[in-house]
Amino acid sequence: MKNKTTEVIFDLETQKFFDEIDDFDPAKLGVSVLSLYRRTVDKNNNEIEGEMLSFWEEDLKKTWEIFNKADRIIGFNSKRFDVLALKPYLPLELNKLPHFDILEQVKDVNGRRVSLDSIAGETLGKRKIDDPRNAITYWVKHDKVSLSKLKRYCEEDVVLTRDIYDFGLKNKKLIFKDYWNTVRTIEVDFSYPEITEKITDEDQGSLF
């Protein structure tokens, strides 16, 4: 891992429910707001600085530069949902960039998908601040108060995602209630992959 690493943790909300479109393509749902937490961490994964940013639909193209400069993009169910929902707005899929999906690893270990709220509740002792269905209701209402609630809801989900990621990275485990309402603990590995630098003939010569 580099001495300093840029990470972007993100989440988004959509304008429609799946039952409002003709298939299950997230790209047709429309994105209402995207919130992200951009930070710099040192080689020991300690945060040096960070900031929360939110973007409404008309400004989503501005996020590409932020994502493109990240050493790791972090989300929850982001590869199978958020990335697809963003396809109409960004020049390339985020999956083509260094992308870590927490749920992907949880499912690989657990064999089943687990909700963000369940992991946050048992791992962090925190919960979502609102019913997820209200996010679309707030967008439809579109008044100042509703949009403020929508933005805060999305940002708080980013905070949960960030804190779950940090807990898993540090403790190498996550805790949640499974399908049968049993509390389970699973081992996880959120560490960065080892980077093996290719040694050229010139580099090799300098070793002797």
Q: Where are each of the predicted segments found?
A:
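Conserved DEDDh/DEDDy metal-dependent 3′-5′ exonuclease domain
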Residues: E47-S118
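Residue-level signal for well-ordered alpha-helical scaffold segments within enzymatic catalytic domains
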Residues: R39, L84-P88, S118-E122, D163, ...
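Conserved RNase H-like, two-metal-ion catalytic cores of nucleic-acid enzymes
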Residues: M1-N68
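A contiguous binding-surface segment within folded domains or other stable secondary-structure elements
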Residues: R113-I129
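Acidic, Mg2+-coordinating catalytic module of metal-dependent nucleases/exonucleases
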Residues: L124-I186
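Acidic active-site catalytic centers that drive phospho-/nucleotidyl reactions
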Residues: D11-E13, D82, D101, D157
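Acidic catalytic cores of enzymes that act on phosphate-bearing nucleotides/polynucleotides
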Residues: N181-F208
